[in-house]
C-alpha cells in the first residue's frame, strides 16, 4: 500500500511538472501565433534544452514583426548565443527604420557585439545617428578645461570648443571613437592658433578657427561624422614669447658669467705664473751678483784690475746711487 501511494505521488509530481512545462511552452507559442510571428514548438523545446530564454527570443521576434521587420527565430537565437543583447538590437532596428536610416540585422548585431563592455550600446549608436550629440573639447574628465595655443606674436590663447557629431553606422565597427575626435579637434585648434599672426586675429574672428578645423576632414576613419565645431569661449593667456625671451636672456647671462669666470681664472693663473717667473729672474740676478766679488778677486790676482781702477769703480757706483736718490725723493719720504 505504501509503495502504491509513493508511486502515485511521484506520478503526480511528474505530471504537474509536465503540465507546467506544457503550459509555459503553450503560452509562449500561443502568444507568438496571435502576434503573427509563429514559432515551431520544436524550436521552443530545442531552445529550452540549449538553455536559451525562449520567451525573450519570442518577444524580440514579436517586436520586430510588429514593426514590419522580418527576422527568423534562428537569427535572434544566434545573436544571443554570440553574447549579444537581442532586445537592444531589435530596438535599434526599429529606431533606424522609423528614422529611415539604412541598418540591417547583421550590422546591428556587429555594432552590439563591438560595443559590449564599453559602456556603449547599439541603441545609443542609432540614437546618436538620429539625434546628434555634443562633445566638449577638451574633455572635462581629462583635467584640462581649455585648449591652449600660442600665436606668432607669442601670446597664449585659450579656447573651449563644442563638437557636434552624428554616428556613422557604416564605420562604427572599427572606427575611431570620441577620444580620437577630441584629440584631432584639439590638434587642429592649436595649429590654427599657431598660424595666426597675432592673438588679436583669433579674438576678432573665432569662427575662423572652427571653419578651418572643420574643413580638414577630421572625421576620416572615425565612427562619427562631424557636423559642426563651435567655439564656446576664447581667453587670452600668458605672454609665452616674453617668458621664453626672459628665459633665454637669463641663460645667456649665465653663459656670459661662466665665460667671464673662466677668463678671470685664466688671468689669475697667468698673474701667478708671471710672479713665479719674476721670482725666478730675481734669483738669477742675485746669483749673478754673488759672482761679482769672486770675479773681482780673480781680476786682482791676475793683475787685470788695479787698485785705482777699483776705487774709480766705487766712486762711480756711489755717484750713481746719489743720483738715483735725488731722482726719487718720494722714496726718502716713505
From Swiss-Prot:
<keyword id="KW-1003">Cell membrane</keyword>
<comment type="subunit">
    <text>Homooligomerizes.</text>
</comment>
<dbReference type="GO" id="GO:0005886">
    <property type="term" value="C:plasma membrane"/>
</dbReference>
<dbReference type="InterPro" id="IPR022853">
    <property type="entry name" value="FloA"/>
</dbReference>
<dbReference type="Pfam" id="PF12127">
    <property type="entry name" value="FloA"/>
</dbReference>
<keyword id="KW-0472">Membrane</keyword>
<feature type="transmembrane region" description="Helical">
    <location>
        <begin position="3"/>
        <end position="23"/>
    </location>
</feature>
<keyword id="KW-1133">Transmembrane helix</keyword>
<comment type="similarity">
    <text>Belongs to the flotillin-like FloA family.</text>
</comment>
<keyword id="KW-0812">Transmembrane</keyword>
<protein>
    <recommendedName>
        <fullName>Flotillin-like protein FloA</fullName>
    </recommendedName>
</protein>
<dbReference type="GO" id="GO:0045121">
    <property type="term" value="C:membrane raft"/>
</dbReference>
<comment type="function">
    <text>Found in functional membrane microdomains (FMM) that may be equivalent to eukaryotic membrane rafts. FMMs are highly dynamic and increase in number as cells age. Flotillins are thought to be important factors in membrane fluidity.</text>
</comment>
Amino acid at each position: 500500500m505504501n509503495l502504491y501511494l509513493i508511486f502515485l505521488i511521484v506520478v503526480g509530481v511528474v505530471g504537474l511538472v509536465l503540465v507546467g512545462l506544457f503550459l509555459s511552452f503553450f503560452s509562449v507559442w500561443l502568444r507568438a501565433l496571435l502576434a503573427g510571428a509563429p514559432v515551431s514548438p520544436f524550436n521552443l523545446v530545442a531552445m529550452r534544452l540549449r538553455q536559451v530564454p525562449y520567451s525573450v527570443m519570442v518577444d524580440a521576434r514579436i517586436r520586430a514583426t510588429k514593426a514590419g521587420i522580418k527576422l527568423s527565430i534562428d537569427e535572434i537565437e544566434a545573436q544571443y548565443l554570440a553574447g549579444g543583447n537581442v532586445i537592444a538590437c531589435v530596438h535599434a532596428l526599429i529606431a533606424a527604420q522609423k528614422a529611415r536610416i539604412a541598418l540591417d540585422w547583421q550590422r546591428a548585431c556587429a555594432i552590439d557585439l563591438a560595443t559590449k563592455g564599453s559602456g556603449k550600446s547599439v541603441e545609443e549608436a542609432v540614437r546618436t545617428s538620429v539625434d546628434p550629440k555634443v562633445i566638449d573639447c577638451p574633455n572635462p574628465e581629462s583635467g584640462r578645461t581649455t585648449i591652449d595655443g600660442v600665436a606668432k606674436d607669442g601670446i597664449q590663447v585659450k579656447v573651449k570648443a563644442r563638437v557636434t557629431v552624428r554616428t556613422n553606422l557604416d564605420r562604427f565597427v572599427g572606427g575611431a571613437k570620441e577620444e580620437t575626435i577630441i584629440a584631432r579637434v584639439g590638434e587642429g585648434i592649436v595649429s590654427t592658433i599657431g598660424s595666426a599672426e597675432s592673438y588679436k586675429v583669433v579674438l576678432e574672428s573665432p569662427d575662423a578657427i572652427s571653419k578651418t578645423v572643420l574643413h580638414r576632414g577630421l572625421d576620416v576613419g572615425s565612427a562619427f561624422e562631424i557636423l559642426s565645431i563651435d567655439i564656446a569661449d576664447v581667453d587670452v593667456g600668458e605672454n609665452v614669447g616674453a617668458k621664453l625671451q626672459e628665459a633665454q636672456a637669463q641663460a645667456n647671462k649665465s653663459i656670459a658669467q661662466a665665460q667671464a669666470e673662466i677668463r678671470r681664472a685664466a688671468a689669475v693663473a697667468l698673474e701667478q705664473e708671471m710672479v713665479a717667473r719674476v721670482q725666478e729672474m730675481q734669483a738669477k740676478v742675485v746669483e749673478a751678483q754673488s759672482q761679482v766679488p769672486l770675479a773681482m778677486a780673480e781680476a786682482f790676482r791676475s793683475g787685470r784690475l788695479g787698485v785705482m781702477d777699483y776705487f774709480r769703480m766705487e766712486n762711480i757706483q756711489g755717484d750713481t746711487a746719489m743720483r738715483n736718490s735725488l731722482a726719487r725723493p718720494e722714496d726718502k719720504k716713505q
